[in-house]
A protein has these predicted regions:
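Flexible "cap/lid" subdomain of the alpha/beta-hydrolase fold that forms the substrate-access gate
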Residues: 1-47, 122-130, 137-138, 142, ...
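Hydrophobic residues on the short alpha-helix immediately C-terminal to a glycine-rich phosphate/catalytic loop
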Residues: 91, 159, 337-341
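Alpha/beta-hydrolase active-site loop signature
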Residues: 82, 106-110, 177, 295-296, ...
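Generic structural signal for small/hydrophobic residues in well-ordered secondary structure
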Residues: 52, 62, 76-79, 88, ...
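Conserved HGGG/HGGXW glycine-rich cap/lid loop of the alpha/beta-hydrolase fold
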Residues: 58-117, 139, 149-155, 162
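Catalytic active-site module of serine/aspartate enzymes centered on a nucleophile-bearing elbow/loop
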Residues: 285, 311-346
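Conserved beta-strand scaffold positions in the cores of enzyme catalytic domains, especially
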Residues: 49, 101-103, 316-318
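Residue-level signal for the nucleotide or nucleotide-sugar donor/cofactor binding architecture
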Residues: 83, 123, 127, 329
């Protein structure tokens, strides 16, 4: 993941050369809303959508499926970096068959508020965590099954550390930010000097600045860099719906993106690695770690968590044929595995 983030980081930031140009992205909140509507149009299940207002004038964009099944512990979905609720389009219908499912855009991403985040990694992380807790209070949820992908997995773990009584089961899907950067990382995987130099030059800029600088060419850039997303959602769309959604999610004001940058060190590693803190987590919180068998992510975090929590429930599941975006690569298998986990709760 570190390598993938850094490559994207460097490629996109070439746009800094043209940073004197005015913003010229053909986007708006209305464009993002319309792109999200297209992502969700194939979902037959009924659902509620609303802004949930939290302190400091912020609001969290929220989707709720099967609200009438409130007798079971609800499943709450946290998306990854650069994502939004629309990327769960392949999962909602299956997951909400037997229980309520909530999905929301993380603070600073998607259609949620995009406030200023602290430049300190600890404080930025806490802002994310507190926004999740404030959302939970406003939604009136006593306990939840918390599932997070990528950055969402990191934040789900951080939330569980601070508010353990609210989490019935923690599901980490290809989580970012768990291992610390090894001292010999550069020796095992040598990084060319020119890349280090480029990274130093570009360090003041946000990871996706180049996408915004690209303006009307940004959508083509998304399509060129990530053609795999069209294939992942081909059962639902045969056009550029997914690329349009990702584009409009990420050319708005870079709020959560800036927070993420401030939580990382070269080259994509977390400043405050989660594995260092996992032993402090309440021993009664069950954890399931889900990885794609074909993922470029190091899957050792699951076994490391097991060794760090010898007296707690920890299970690792590998989804065959799936990469980092497990929920989209093999949605049927992923959905069934998550439903099985939820059924073990109640």
């Amino acid at each position: 993941l570190a390598e993938e983030i850094f490559i994207l980081y460097c490629c996109c930031r070439l746009g800094w050369l043209f940073s004197w140009l005015p913003a010229w992205c053909p986007t708006s909140l209305l464009h993002l809303k319309e792109a999200e509507d297209k992502m969700l149009k194939c979902i037959a299940s009924t659902y509620n959508k609303q802004y949930v207002y939290i302190p400091n004038g912020n609001k969290i964009w929220t989707l709720t499926f099967s609200p009438d099944l409130s007798h079971k512990t609800p499943l709450v979905l946290l998306h990854g970096f650069g994502g939004g609720v629309g990327l769960w389009a392949l999962n909602f219908e299956d997951l909400c068959e037997n229980r309520t499912v909530h999905a929301f855009d993380l603070l600073g991403f998607g259609r949620s508020s995009r406030p200023h985040f602290d430049t300190d990694a600890r404080e930025a992380e806490n802002q994310f965590v507190e926004s999740i807790e404030q959302w939970r209070k406003e939604m009136g949820l006593e306990k939840m099954i918390l599932l997070g992908h990528n950055l969402g997995g990191f934040l789900a773990a951080a939330y569980s550390l601070k508010y353990p009584s609210r989490v019935k089961h923690l599901i980490l899907v290809e989580p970012w930010g768990f291992p610390e950067r090894p001292d010999n990382a550069e020796h095992e995987r040598p990084i060319p000097i020119w890349i280090k130099a480029l990274g130093a030059i570009l360090s003041p800029f946000n990871p996706l600045a180049g996408l915004r600088i690209a303006g009307p060419f940004g959508l083509s850039l998304v399509q060129r860099l990530r053609p795999d997303f069209k294939r992942k959602y081909s059962s639902m769309f045969d056009d550029n719906t997914v690329a349009e959604y990702i584009y409009h999610c990420n050319v708005q004001s870079p709020s959560g993106e800036t927070a993420f940058k401030n939580m990382t060190i070269p080259y994509g590693w977390a400043k405050r690695p989660m594995l260092q803190r996992i032993p402090q987590m309440d021993r009664d919180i069950p954890i399931t770690v889900v990885y794609g068998a074909r993922s470029c992510i190091d899957g050792n975090s699951g076994s490391t968590i097991q060794s760090l929590r010898p007296n707690s429930y920890v299970k690792t599941i590998a989804i065959l044929g799936a990469g980092h975006y497990v929920y989209a690569d093999q949605p049927e298998d992923f959905n069934q595995k998550v439903k099985d986990i939820c059924d073990s709760v109640d």
